[in-house]
Each structure stands twice: as C-alpha cells, then as structure tokens.
Amino acid sequence: MVQPQLTRDSMIGPYPLPPVDDALRAQARAQPGQWLDFLDPMIDPATPNPPAFAVQGGYRADELGQIVEYSINPRYEPSELRAGFRCSSAFELTLWRALHGFNTVGMLADAFASATLLAYVDHPGAEDLPAVPDPDQPGTSLLLVCSSWTFCSWENAVEVTGSFLLGLTSNTDAVLIINPGTGLSLRLAARTMMSLARTPHQQHQ
C-alpha cells in the first residue's frame, strides 16, 4: 500500500535509472563533460540526438569524468516493449510513469482528476457505484476503477471522470483501487488523491 503522508512532490515508484557502478564510472571517465543517457529499449543506444520522449534520464559527467548529477525525464514515453502494453490515455501514461519513478504523485493526482475512467458497477445499466468491502481490512470500502478496458476484468462498468469520483468520495474513507489485480495497479485513499490534485485554476498558477 502507498504510504500515507504524501505531498505533491512525493515519488511512489522506484528510482528508474541504473545504479552507478564501475562500468558507468568508466564510461563517465571516457566521456567527460557529457550526459550519459539511458534510452528506451526500442531505441538503438548509439542513436545520435534521440527524441526527448525516448530518453529515460541520465547521469552527467563533469570535466574530470566524475558523475556529479542525474536527471529523470518526467516526459518519458515508454514503448510497448518497455511498458508491456500500449498506453491508451494521458492518465494511463502518467500512472505508469508514477509507478515507475518518472512522475510525482501530484502529477498523478492531476491526471486522475481530469481523466475519464471505468468504474465498477454490479449489474448492466446501474448508475450507482457500489462500495466493495475490503476483505483484508474490515470496515474499509473500496472503489474499483480502471484506466481502460485493457486492465478491466469485470463486464459491467460505467464511464466516469476522475473529478466526479473525487467529489463523490470527498467526505468518506473510501479507498481507490486503480486497475485491481494487474501490473498497473495502485491503491490510494480517495481523500488523499483529492488533497493532492490541483484544480484547473491552480494548475495555471
């Protein structure tokens, strides 16, 4: 489960770049004053001037060939080879980035609020979204949503916006489960998601 006290700048995914090892230090000594970039696996590492979206990040070597800085690309767009699927929406891409250490949880919350999602309903034509009891935490209600049909395992779902879900759960202790049971799953209290999301007005400040 995601740890509670989160801020907009919190990272919930692992550090995405390879660790600095002897081979990387040797490469830095051989390329002083340059960035050592790590590209998407679909891109040939020897490609000159690769597109920015294909760069995962990198380390910078100073003039003495010492690694002194790193950079993680928050706009990295993983290929299907890297992600294991093709992202079908801006939210799905941001969710993948957040879970893999490229985007902050604040960026995720903003994307969730503006996303169109699939929410679980218990029968065709239902309009009310059922709160599912958490089998592991009695007394906790779960709200099940998916980022797309790619990750949806139930037949009955309705399209809703993330902002609608946040408004619906603002005064509850409901927990959001995004893409339950998949490799792109996240569990987060709805109240936490709402507190981290900026309104469109705030996003321009």
What are these regions (language model features)?
Residues 2-205:
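An interfacial alpha-helical scaffold signature
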